[in-house]
């Protein structure tokens, strides 16, 4: 028995090729296959009539934030823009990578990496805590609320236990501390240094925002003015409901070298 053809497709055949049953120009498929896949529907220009097909999922917008834990501008952007945007958008619309290092410098002393940070040793410790937290938690949705808690609180370096209790009680603070104090943390921070040093163009300040592998002054300004609006414009899939919201005020400064 021949495959069933939808009434919509039959109507299209009647309208577009009356009496012939031939395909549209550029479409090499018979009418009964026009709604068999999204690719064929697009080729035959009938996708709006193939209600049974789902549009292929658009890739998420890829955002990488290069920052440092005690930079006021970084904290503002992470708390006021990035975290709120992440809460509002579904995972399929936005994928985030965090790289805490920023304007730090590193040197290898007798085979061990040492770090000097723009806002002093406390910032190096904060960078290391957040890096080890990410390493131990693995899952972004587990560690990002903890980082938000640290960055929005009174002390990035002293509130880990409290933030874990609220946002990720399943994580072991002892393992995070061991990472911070051991070779693993230094190796992870060295990797962050390599990622930061490999930026093209080189970063001039933090927060430094890379969108889909690209950084421009225009993207940076748009991200700091309204990150939600920027992601909504760039996302090629069906727009989430939150994309009707307005943006937050623009961050007034950076932390430069």
Residues of each region from the PLM?
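A short beta-strand-turn-helix
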Residues: 45-61
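C-terminal cap of thioredoxin/glutaredoxin-like
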Residues: 2-7, 66, 153-257
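Structural alpha/beta surface segment adjacent to cysteine/selenocysteine redox centers
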Residues: 59-173, 238, 245-254
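Disulfide-rich extracellular modules and peptides
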Residues: 29, 37, 46, 52, ...
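N-terminal signal peptide
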Residues: 2-5, 12-37
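Intrinsically disordered, low-complexity regulatory regions enriched in Ser/Pro/Gly/Thr
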Residues: 54-59, 88-92, 199-203, 224
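Extracellular secreted precursors and ectodomains with disulfide-bonded cysteine-rich loops/domains
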Residues: 25, 33, 42, 48, ...
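Catalytic cores of eukaryotic secretory-pathway lumenal/extracellular enzymes that build
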Residues: 10-11, 105
